[in-house]
């Protein structure tokens, strides 16, 4: 998992960016659910983009597959936690974000150049972005308190559930 974090870290917009960390949040029949965070040294630091291109590639890899719930989504902002009661496995869906863990958050993440990569991810696979054009998910600066590092110095960038090795 560390190698994937370091590859991810090379694709982060830097603003007192310290590194990456993850935590295990659940163990289910669908696998282990991890949350991945970008870490910063100042509580007011803001993450506004995660990007990759030829000179700063990103690898999101897995030895088996990522769990993708049938009613889930590629971006956390489109997951409504009100549906967790009816679809309990939805809370373990794999997704990307900048700060928000569901539709109750403040992040309005946009993307450019990610359609092919997100499609592979939604099919359960990983991807590598290493092209001249690249890809990014991002939000407008100063629009989302969830994108600020806060007291713990962390900004959530994704949740990944797998029965394999990330």
Question: Can you say where each PLM-predicted feature lies in the sequence?
Answer:
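Bacterial N-terminal signal peptides that target proteins for export
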Residues: 1-3
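Non-catalytic macromolecular-recognition regions in eukaryotic signaling proteins
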Residues: 16-166
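Sec/Tat signal peptide C-region and signal peptidase I cleavage site
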Residues: 6-15
């Amino acid at each position: 998992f560390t190698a994937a974090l370091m590859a991810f870290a090379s694709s982060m917009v830097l603003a007192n960016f310290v590194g990456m960390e993850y935590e295990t949040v659940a163990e289910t029949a669908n696998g282990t659910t991890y949350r991945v965070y970008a870490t910063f040294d100042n509580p007011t630091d803001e993450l506004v983009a995660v990007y990759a291109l030829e000179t700063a590639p990103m690898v999101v890899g897995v030895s088996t597959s990522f769990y993708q719930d049938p009613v889930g989504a590629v971006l956390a902002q489109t997951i409504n936690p009100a549906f967790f009661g009816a679809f309990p496995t939805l809370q373990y869906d794999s997704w990307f974000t900048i700060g928000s863990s569901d539709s109750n958050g403040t992040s309005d993440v946009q993307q450019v150049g990610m359609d092919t990569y997100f499609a592979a991810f939604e099919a359960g696979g990983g991807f590598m972005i290493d092209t001249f054009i690249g890809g990014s998910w991002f939000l407008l600066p100063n629009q989302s308190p969830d994108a600020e590092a806060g007291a713990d110095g962390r900004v959530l960038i994704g949740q990944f559930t797998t029965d394999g090795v990330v």
